[in-house]
Design a protein with these regions (language model features):
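Terminal transmembrane helix and immediately flanking juxtamembrane interfaces
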Residues: 10-39, 112-144
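Membrane-interfacial alpha-helical segments at the cytosolic side of multi-pass membrane proteins
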Residues: 61-75, 120-133
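Membrane-water interface at transmembrane helix exits
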Residues: 33, 69-73, 97, 101, ...
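Interfacial helix-loop-helix junctions of multi-pass membrane proteins
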Residues: 42-50, 95-123
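Hydrophobic alpha-helical membrane segments
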Residues: 60, 85-96
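"…centered on the first transmembrane helix and the immediately adjacent amphipathic helix/loop
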Residues: 12-71, 86
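Internal alpha-helical transmembrane segments of multi-pass membrane proteins
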Residues: 75-88, 144
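Short, small-residue-biased leader/transition segments that mark boundaries at the very start
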Residues: 1-8
Length: 144
């Protein structure tokens, strides 16, 4: 049986390859909104613990890269260049978000510890994705 990856390899489907990455794109848009909007979740209304925002940053980028791993594996399996591009892209995006927060006068500020949390989350997302996504696909194949 032909998989989704085979469909996007056809010449007539090449312009639509990005559609296979819609889940990753949606997560990226949500992260961008949360990073650049002025107080998007009214964070002053609740307090968890010191550094909770760093944990949130790490989890967002972990999720972004894990979903990216899922999309890559679903379409074409893992290759080192694709995974390196994914994690480096997420890290660069995290840095860009911090720079934009510093440049925009929206009551937000650039924080290099946020960038560090974004980067750590992206790397952990890659480790988690590479080790869990193939397993999940094998498990799902058993039930189909």
């Amino acid at each position: 049986s032909r998989g989704l990856g085979d469909v996007y390899k056809r010449q007539d489907m090449r312009p639509f390859r990005f559609l296979a990455f819609v889940p990753t794109i949606i997560v990226l848009v949500v992260i961008t909104y949360l990073s650049l909007a002025k107080n998007p979740v009214h964070s002053q209304e609740f307090y968890l613990f010191e550094g909770a925002d760093k944990l949130v940053h790490g989890c967002m980028y972990l999720g972004l890269v894990w979903i990216g791993c899922f999309d890559i594996y679903r379409v074409s399996k893992f290759t080192a260049p694709k995974l390196i591009l994914l994690v480096c892209g997420a890290i660069v995006w995290g840095g860009l978000m911090e720079l934009l927060q510093g440049a925009m006068s929206m009551g937000r500020s650039a924080d290099w510890y946020d960038f560090l949390a974004n980067s750590c989350g992206a790397i952990l997302g890659l480790i988690l994705g590479v080790n869990s996504v193939p397993y999940l696909f094998r498990k799902c194949k058993k039930f189909s």
